[in-house]
A protein has these predicted regions:
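A short glycine-rich beta-alpha junction/loop motif
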Residues: 95-102, 131-159
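Sequence-specific dsDNA recognition surfaces
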Residues: 12-27, 41-72, 94
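A short beta-sheet element
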Residues: 39, 63-119
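Glycine- and charge-enriched low-complexity intrinsically disordered segments
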Residues: 112-132
Length: 194
């Protein structure tokens, strides 16, 4: 979808939503050979997802559920309502099969602007209006809530987008190096304590 200054971008027209993987405690494995599952603790608002405390399961997600570089990972349900709606983006770290758990979702778009929209005040206000539950119940939002969000695109957005992307590229380079270091560390520890 082409975006122009002064237009309105609706997330449902710019991308799609993919539900997370449902699994049970019996599907969880100790090895890092299965599918890596990201949960709300792996989401930090506006930053790339973190790879700490991943859950590994012996279930195979469908093709659409496998995370791709640039996907937005969203907390869709949580006992703490302030965590619902928080979003990070996925940076491919070479994990063969990574997905999100059932209480999270994936927003996928080819439009580079959408990543930044999930960090906006407008997005956060919309999520606060949509949250269901809370007060002891699990608070949640629905895929339709995400896809219904519309953003007014200001004039000159291209210049700001270029600056944001340039800063982000530098940040991601450092993150990818860190991911590689962590992968080597994990491999060495696995070999050492067989």
């Amino acid at each position: 979808m082409n975006v122009t200054s002064g237009s309105v971008l609706k997330l449902g027209n710019a991308g799609k939503f993919v539900r997370g993987l449902t699994y049970s405690a019996s599907d969880v494995i100790e090895d890092t050979i299965g599918t890596a599952v990201m949960r709300s603790n792996n989401i930090s608002n506006g930053d790339p997802v973190n790879f700490e405390e991943l859950v590994w399961v012996n279930k195979i997600p469908n093709h659409e559920q496998i995370l791709r570089d640039g996907d937005i990972v969203i907390c869709m349900a949580n006992g703490s309502s302030h965590l619902v709606g928080k979003a990070s983006y996925y940076v491919d770290c070479g994990i063969e099969s990574a997905t999100v758990g059932a209480f999270c979702g994936i927003y996928r778009s080819d439009n580079p602007l959408t990543k930044w929209l999930f960090q906006s005040k407008h997005y956060k206000k919309h999520i606060q209006r949509c949250i269901q539950g809370g007060n002891g119940a699990i608070a949640n939002i629905y895929p339709e809530d995400i896809l219904a969000i519309s953003f007014n695109i200001p004039s000159g957005y291209e210049r700001v987008l270029n600056i944001l992307n340039s800063l982000e590229d530098k940040y991601l380079l450092e993150q990818k190096l860190l991911c590689r270091y962590l992968a080597v560390k994990s491999h060495l520890l696995a070999q050492m304590f067989i």
